[in-house]
A protein has these predicted regions:
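Hydrophobic positions on the alpha1 helix immediately C-terminal to the Walker A/P-loop
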Residues: 185
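Short HxH-centered metal-ligating active-site micro-motif
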Residues: 392-424
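Transmembrane alpha-helical segments and their cytosolic interface motifs
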Residues: 182, 360-362
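Flexible phosphate-sensing "switch/lid" loops adjacent to ATP/NTP-binding sites
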Residues: 1-173, 189-351, 355-358, 365-367, ...
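The conserved Walker
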Residues: 177-178
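A short, polar/charged loop-to-alpha-helix boundary motif
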Residues: 378-394
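Short clusters of small/polar residues that mark proteolytic maturation junctions
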Residues: 374-375
Length: 497
């Protein structure tokens, strides 16, 4: 994989910049932490070299100064809101986050329930945390929020909220997902800190959009693609341009809310420390891009992946809004991209046509070589492509059988005769297990198996929608999958995922 981002430079520069921001205030900074902290795979895809846990590693450099406060909305507890990427409710995700933070040595100070209203589910959640030794605090709905600034910044507004007791200079405010009330929690704390004579500060940490690269840079367009369902729009920050004469990039929601936030700062502290939403940020990612073209190309590919994902979700669920698809089509046009222009798509379709329209899969290796797989009597197309790619990486002739038919057929019998399956062909996870068994006595199979790490970052395209098993295996291997929004059996009404 070509590297476009210096991760070591980022860790050092980002942690130092946050230290500097702490010092600008009364040695107390509330840092609103947006995006994914443990597993930012989007950033790792568009900034090759950025590690998925880079933000966590950066925080670990500040762990002696930092404590974590997790916020969750009472509304999300009552509604049992689900975090899509993990398939668990927000309240359970709070417990997962606590374990994850504590597991790496970060101090979790407390949990704050925002938009608090008395409800059995909320009280049970608080009791569960308290029984586990985790302190909880309550923040309430404020009439007129966010526009009635005078009421919000008063004893009847922020003053009604619990003051979250914290111990360390850096307080990281994070949440299971968006809309949890991170910014409001930070500003409420500033109100209470100033009441106590502590001139604390606020800053915002988000990786995207990157403020100091062009508005239409593919990295920033890829962020818009990732948030197409939210209809976030990257914009030139007009406040920064007016204050400094410098063009920077921010996104619409931060720009729209800035006058309100600025007015709150003035009421809390007497004057605002910031002249623009860009000023509020602490993101240093743009300074760590070391090969712009590598990041541009990676981001173009990400935009295409997001477009295919949207089409597939619409096919599977029928719940995708047309506005999301239109937004992604617009971004494709802005980036000069077209469906079918990638070699991996072209080769997959060519292989399908050559086999009478049967499903086919193609994998593009890191050197640009494209390997295909067809649907056969023993393997599905995606499993076939996987084995063929491993052969190519290991320098093994394609005609070599790494797993014998005699080894595969009993597995097919198990699937169809005993486990109630209808498709006898092996999925990717099944062929990998079979390959692992063969590797014990077959040196070529062992050589192929050892190439699995080299599939990380490879693009894969399937001419049909894949099962959840095949999709999950590709994800665990770190491969970047796209599919045509077509079922293998289009006439069926129900399709198992």
């Amino acid at each position: 994989m070509k590297i476009g981002f210096d991760n070591d430079k980022y860790l050092a520069m980002q942690s130092e910049h946050i230290r500097e921001r702490i010092q600008k205030f009364d040695n107390k900074l509330y840092l609103e932490f947006g995006g994914k902290l443990f597993d930012d795979y989007h950033a790792s895809r568009v900034l090759p070299g950025f590690q998925p846990d880079s933000k966590l590693q950066m925080l670990l450099q500040l762990k002696d100064q930092a404590e974590i406060v997790i916020v969750i909305s009472a509304e999300d507890i009552v509604s049992s809101k689900i975090r899509g990427d993990y398939g668990i409710t927000y309240d359970l995700d709070v417990l997962r986050l606590i374990d994850a933070f504590q597991g790496v040595g970060l101090y979790v100070g407390s949990v704050c329930v925002t938009k608090y209203t008395a409800a059995p589910e909320v009280e049970a959640f608080e009791k569960r945390l308290n029984d586990l030794g985790i302190r909880t605090f309550r923040h309430y709905k404020i009439a007129g929020y966010p526009n009635d600034v005078a009421h919000i910044v008063s004893d009847e507004g922020y003053g009604r909220n619990d003051y979250i007791e914290t111990e360390r200079p850096l307080v990281v405010i994070t949440a299971p997902g968006p809309g949890s009330g991170k910014m409001a929690t930070c500003l409420s704390q500033l109100y209470h800190e100033y009441k106590r004579g502590v001139k604390a500060g606020y800053a915002k940490f988000e990786t995207f959009p990157i403020w100091n690269i062009p508005l239409k840079h593919p990295v920033n367009l890829a962020y818009e693609a990732a948030t197409a369902d939210l209809n976030d729009v990257n914009m030139i920050d007009p406040f920064h341009l007016e204050a400094y004469g410098v063009t920077t990039v921010n996104y619409n929601r931060d720009i729209e809310i800035f006058p309100v936030v600025n007015a709150m700062f003035e009421l809390i502290a007497g004057k605002s420390p910031y002249k623009s939403p860009t000023d509020m940020g602490v993101n240093m990612a743009g300074n760590c891009i070391v090969d712009d073209e590598v990041c541009r190309e990676a981001s173009r590919k990400e935009i295409v992946r997001r477009y295919f994902k949207c089409l597939c979700q619409q096919k599977i669920t029928g719940t995708v809004h047309e506005s999301e698809r239109y937004k992604l089509e617009l971004l494709m046009n802005q980036a000069g991209l077209n469906v079918g222009s990638r070699a991996v798509e072209q080769q997959a379709h060519a292989r399908s046509e050559a086999t009478g329209g049967a499903p086919a899969t193609a994998i593009e290796l890191s050197d640009g070589t494209v390997i295909t797989g067809k649907t056969g009597p023993l393997l599905g197309a995606t499993a076939s492509a996987l084995i063929n790619a491993l052969k190519a990486l290991a320098g093994i002739p394609q005609e070599t059988d790494l797993v014998s038919a005699a080894a595969i057929e009993p597995i097919q019998t198990l699937k169809t005769n005993y486990l109630g399956g209808k498709n006898p062909r092996l999925h990717t996870d099944e062929i990998l297990i079979a390959l692992s068994s063969s590797a014990a006595t077959n040196e070529l199979a062992a050589a192929a198996l050892h190439q699995l790490p080299n599939l990380k970052g490879c693009d894969v395209h399937s001419t049909v929608l894949l099962s959840g098993v095949d999709t999950g295996t590709r994800n665990r291997l770190g491969m970047y999958l796209t599919c045509d929004p077509v079922y293998e059996e289009e006439d069926r009404k129900y399709h198992k995922q």
